[in-house]
Amino acid sequence: MKIEEDRRSYRWQRVSAKGLLSSISLYLLLSSFISITFLSCTEKPKHFTHEVLNRMTPIKDQGDSETCWIYAMLAAIETEHLAWGDSVNLSPYYIEKMLEQEPQCPKSKRGEPTTTLRLLEKYGICGYDAMRNVKTPAPKWVFMLGATYTPQEFARSVCKPGEYIALMSDDDKPYYEESELEVPDNWLHDRYLNIPMDTLFAKTERAVLQHHGVCWEDKGHAMAIVGIAHDDEGEKYFIMKNSWGTDRPYGGLEYISFDQFKKTTIAVEMTKEAFWGRKGSPNPK
């Protein structure tokens, strides 16, 4: 994703002491670009009051990889389970490792949150403590609370096949029908339910208020939505769990205004239960 390419370039350049001045200039340029792109990183940290902050696992750092889509989707799954009182901390490195077996995967390792769901169902998953680095061999067994699982069995225990629904809002496509999300990162050609943006926003807000895990993306980045806040002027924001580590103005959280959500969102993933509001609801509106 574009933002992550710029971030990786910045990290590479700052290695050289001779390039310190240019690195500082590049950092300022990128900071400005990122703020303009999705307005989650303000030039000066603002004060936010949290209205809802759902439970989450510790903030992780994707480093120089372009795998935010893995971190964001797994973070949403983790928050979903924490809401049930079921503690689970999943390894993004396991999914990244499995990409080596996917011939369609680009060298950049870019993808969609729905790609994470497909890989999780196909290859399984393990706990974070069992695989903290992509260079670590993927475990053949998962040991959890005295039980032993294969990675596939463990994956089914944390994310049932078909449990999540992918949503998008595209005025050029029929609403309430499934269509392919036409972005380069959707190399598995996954299909999303297309709904009006006002409906997508309302579904997302309700899901967060009901403590569900939600995965969000714009054209440059993906994060998990973990809460709702407002600033001192009363403007409302979604609280995002990012995957760029904790050495940031808000300790690894970011804030996307409701208005910016409506302008930049290209897709959201949540459980079908969160989407319906209750199980079995016949009315998607």
Where are these regions (language model features)?
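Compositionally biased, intrinsically disordered low-complexity segments enriched in Pro/Arg/Gln/His
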Residues: 28-29
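Active-site signature of cysteine proteases
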Residues: 57, 146-285
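Papain-like cysteine protease catalytic cores
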Residues: 88-153
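Acidic, Ala/Val/Gly-enriched low-complexity intrinsically disordered segments
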Residues: 4-6, 15-17
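Active-site nucleophilic cysteine motif
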Residues: 62-78, 105-118, 221
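Bacterial Sec-dependent signal peptides at the C-terminal "C-region" and cleavage site
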Residues: 33-47
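Cross-family signature of deubiquitinases and ubiquitin-like deconjugating cysteine proteases
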Residues: 42-43, 55-83, 98
